[in-house]
């Protein structure tokens, strides 16, 4: 299996991350119109930053993503951007969320991240199931 590497002028990299994060209070709100909105928002925000979504799954109470993040962006700054902007965009698109979550706090603090090496196929299967 050939690994796809990314490159800059003097650098080559192959960095993939498995990321999991939850809505505030781990509420089961990621369904129907919220689910489709979040998928669209995540794809748009990732394309703005040059982040490739390899695999992703929106569960009712958490999100799994397998992503390739460029070296110029740290994982923590990307997650701050992704969670912050997606929350603002969700509250703009679905104004009724403010009654469940308060003022513009859609995601819980923190997230889980793990680097992905040779076990990429295993993690893809885990995310899909």
Language-model regions, residue ranges each:
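Basic nucleic-acid-binding interfaces
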Residues: 1-129
């Amino acid at each position: 299996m050939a690994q796809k590497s990314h490159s800059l002028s003097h650098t080559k990299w192959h960095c993939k991350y498995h990321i999991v994060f939850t809505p505030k209070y781990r509420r089961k709100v990621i369904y129907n119109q919220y689910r489709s909105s979040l998928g669209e928002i995540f794809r748009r925000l990732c394309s703005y930053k040059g982040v490739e979504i390899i695999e992703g799954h929106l569960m009712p109470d958490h999100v799994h993503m397998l992503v390739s993040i460029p070296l110029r962006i740290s994982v923590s700054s990307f997650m701050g951007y992704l969670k912050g902007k997606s929350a603002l965009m969700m509250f703009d698109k679905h104004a009724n969320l403010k009654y469940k979550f308060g003022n513009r706090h859609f995601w819980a603090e923190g997230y889980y991240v793990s680097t992905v090496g040779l076990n990429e196929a295993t993690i893809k299967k885990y995310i899909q199931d």
